[in-house]
A protein has these predicted regions:
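Active-site-adjacent loop/helix surface patches within enzyme catalytic domains
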Residues: 24, 28-205
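Second-shell loop/turn segments in exported
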Residues: 85-86, 110, 149-152, 175-186, ...
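C-terminal motif of bacterial Sec signal peptides marking the signal peptidase cleavage site
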Residues: 13-16
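Acidic/histidine-rich, metal-coordinating catalytic segments
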Residues: 204-219
C-alpha cells in the first residue's frame, strides 16, 4: 500500500513539474503582417440583396452578415415551420430616425464611417447624383447616436436608423459664434426621399425624426441651424414644426414671462419641465445653467434657426409652447 501511495505521489509531482515547465517555456507568438483582403461582393437574388460574410470584429460583437427577409433558426433534427406566423405581438426595432452631418468631405466621410468604430445606416453625399450609400443593414445597430435620450428612450443606437449627411459643419468666428455650412438643394431632396421611405416602412412618427443635437444637446450640434427642417415639414410632411398662428397666440404671454419672470427660479423650472415633457434630456434645476443653455440652443437649431444663442427669448418660449401643445 505504501509503495502504491509513493508511486502515485511521484507521478503527481512529475506531472506538476512538466506543467510548470510548459508554462515557463511557452514562446510569444511571432508578429505577422496582416494581408489586405478584398471584400466579398454583395449577392443578388431576384430583388433581394444578401451579404453572407462577416468582415467585422466578432470579438466586439460586430457582424456584417445580412440575411434578408425572415431570419429563422436551424436546430438539428427539427424543422422550423411558419404555420402560425406571424404573431401580432411584435414591433420594429427602428423607432427613430436620427440625422447627422459628418463634418468631413465625401472621401473622409466614407473612410471614417466604414473603417472605424463609428457608423451609420446611410450616408448622403453632397454630389448631385442619384446615389445614397448604405453602410449598415437596417436590422443591425449602427454606432451613430452615442450617449443619447429622447422622452423615455435612452441609448438610441438600439432603436434608430442613423443617416449621416456629408457637410463640413461649422467654423468659429472672432466673436466665438459658430458659422455653419448650408446644404445644397439636391442633397436635401435625397434626404427627404430617404427619410420618407424609412419612416413609412417602419411607421416612425414625426416626433421621432430628430437631429443628433436633439438627442444629445450637451454634446452635439449636428445637423445644425442651416438644416431645413421647415422645408422638410412643409414640402415633404417630414418631422415636426409649429403652427404660426399658435406661436402668435402664445407670444404676448411669452413676452411678459421673459420680461418679468426671467430670473425667477419657478419660471426657469417651468421652462425646463416643458423641454423635458417635449422630449429633451434636461435636469430640473431652476437655474439658467450650462445644460439648460445647451438644450435651448439645440431647440433653436431645429425650430428657430435665425438666432441660436442659447438664450430663452419670447419667440423661443412661444414656439416651445406651440410645439408642446401640438405634439402632446
Amino acid at each position: 500500500m505504501r509503495k502504491v501511495l509513493f508511486i502515485t505521489s511521484l507521478n503527481i509531482i512529475l506531472f506538476s513539474c512538466v506543467s510548470q515547465k510548459n508554462v515557463v517555456s511557452s514562446a510569444s507568438p511571432t508578429p505577422t503582417t496582416q494581408k489586405i483582403v478584398e471584400k466579398p461582393k454583395i449577392e443578388h437574388h431576384g430583388t433581394e440583396d444578401f451579404y453572407r460574410v462577416n468582415i467585422a470584429d466578432s470579438a466586439k460583437n460586430n457582424n456584417t452578415i445580412s440575411y434578408g427577409s425572415i431570419v429563422s433558426a436551424k436546430p438539428k433534427k427539427y424543422k422550423i415551420t411558419k404555420t402560425y406566423f406571424p404573431s401580432l405581438g411584435q414591433g420594429f426595432r427602428q423607432r427613430f430616425i436620427i440625422l447627422h452631418y459628418t463634418a468631413l468631405d465625401n472621401e473622409k466621410s466614407i473612410r471614417v464611417l466604414t473603417q472605424q468604430s463609428v457608423s451609420s445606416h446611410y450616408l448622403v453625399s453632397d454630389l448631385d447624383d442619384h446615389e445614397i450609400y448604405q453602410l449598415v443593414d437596417e436590422n443591425k445597430r449602427a454606432y451613430h447616436a452615442g450617449i443619447s435620450s429622447w422622452k423615455n428612450s435612452n441609448n438610441l443606437n438600439d432603436s434608430s436608423i442613423g443617416i449621416e449627411i456629408v457637410n463640413t459643419g461649422y467654423v468659429v468666428d472672432s466673436l466665438g459664434k459658430r458659422l455653419f455650412q448650408a446644404f445644397p438643394e439636391h442633397q436635401i431632396e435625397k434626404i427627404a426621399v430617404l427619410v420618407k421611405d424609412i419612416s413609412k416602412r417602419y411607421m416612425i412618427p414625426p416626433t421621432n425624426i430628430l437631429a443628433h443635437s436633439d438627442i444629445a444637446p450637451t454634446r452635439k450640434q449636428d445637423p445644425g441651424p442651416l438644416f431645413p427642417w421647415k422645408t422638410l415639414y412643409e414640402k415633404h410632411q417630414i418631422g415636426m414644426w409649429y403652427d404660426e398662428d399658435k406661436k402668435q397666440e402664445f407670444y404676448p404671454s411669452a413676452l411678459e414671462d421673459t420680461t418679468t419672470l426671467y430670473e425667477d427660479a419657478s419660471f426657469i423650472r417651468k421652462i425646463q419641465l416643458t423641454f423635458k415633457s417635449f422630449g429633451y434630456d434636461i435636469q430640473i434645476t431652476g437655474m439658467w445653467d450650462k445644460q439648460t443653455k445647451s438644450v435651448i440652443e439645440a431647440f433653436q437649431y431645429h425650430f428657430r434657426p435665425e438666432n441660436y444663442d442659447g438664450i430663452l427669448d419670447a419667440e423661443t418660449w412661444s414656439i416651445l409652447q406651440a410645439l408642446a401643445q401640438k405634439y402632446k
